[in-house]
Amino acid sequence: MLYPAIEQVKELFENYKTVPVFYELLMDSCTPIQLFNCLHEAYDDCFILESVDNKDQWGRYSYVGIDPKCEYILDKHVVTVKEKGKADESVKVDDPIAFFSEIIEGHKSPRFNNYPKLTGGLIGFFAYDMIRYFEKTLCNPPEDDLKLPDADLHLFEKIVAYDHLSNKAVIILNINKSDDLETKYKESEKICNEVVETLRNYKPVMKTPKTMEDNITVKSNITKEHYLANVEKAKEYIKEGDIFQIVPSQRFEIDNPPDSFDVYRMLRSTNPSPYLYYFKHNDYAVAGASPEMLVSVENRTVVTRPIAGTIKRGATYDEDIRNEQQLLNDPKERAEHTMLVDLGRNDIGKVSEFGSVTVTDMMIVERYSKVMHLVSNVKGTLREDKKPLDALMAVLPAGTLSGAPKVRAMEIIDELETTKRGLYGGTVGYLAFDGSLDTCIAIRTVLFKNNKAYIQAGGGVVADSVPENEYQESCNKAMAVINAIKEASKL
């Protein structure tokens, strides 16, 4: 039986344009990975979003989106709209914030207590380069060799949420005010029955692990000497007063990588993170395990959580405590973190009510499976004349992936780096029908395209940075993801 009943849906249409309906079934013999595999076999263009908090506890829900209604691909001020059964449509867009916000507002929906938060919305990515739509001085990007769009978002009205608390699957469908309610409600019941049959008939196939040699070759898009020279050049700009901090990077690639979803499975196993995501669309796939929120908006509260400062976990409890104190007392890490908190306050302040921006946590230590980070929490109240996407674009890209001052740092990054960043340093997440937004920074992320896997990583450079150390930091950050690819090749 669907919830809410058809009579309640009708009442809700007095205030909302879209109403989600829910169907629950027990799935205690199924994992989220099996759920995704089952649905991915039956439906095109699925995604999975999951979360593990810093106490290594799974977030309550894993979300699998199925059968998107349409896709919006933004590139060079043109949105290509792809919808099943229709010819592609191209729309010239001067203001992408207004374009995508209008879609969400056209699906305004209520929030139901005791049901999954994400019931439908736009899910996908915005590239690092989105800022070029609003900062006209950033007009000389490096070579765009990967040819990714500036944004790729799918409109999902069908989601299956796996409840880790009750071991139930919650099938979520959306009914629009413009639909014939009685017809659509019956159709929703039919779709739920079809999804239930698909799930019940699924027979997972156990793979036999491969006993193969580790033959994965990794290469960078620049030499070590080039990276060291970039750090030295960045320090010159800092010395001259152009910037205080900057985040140069390098991009690694692997030919003939293993299956992209197997890589996701290894990432969630070896790097459990607050933001875990996988999607495969058109000619590319993305698998990520990001530790860092970019921005979230809920009930007009805007939050960003800068992470800057990292040290490895200790092998013992005592070593872990020593490492924590070393991180907290490192003057370079503290100075860099403070700069990025100030940048976050400035970014949030652009869209928040005057006087509402506060730092609710300052330089606390959060522990993850292999490292611990310095993290701060910056909050504000979204102004009445601003939309959640305004908050996203005020922060994108994060200062932790660009530098401070942000625009000047990005101009220098364009000068130093040989290829356009694209997904790296951009954001992955969702814009929900209820008006909430939750996005992370696209780091610890693999892009699969052209039969290659691409992993990009960098590190913050300040006045006293040691080039060799910065090079090693970028390699170490990438290695966590590269190791997951190596392990996935054995599945």
Predicted features along the sequence, with ranges:
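Extended alpha-helical targeting/anchoring segments
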Residues: M1-L491
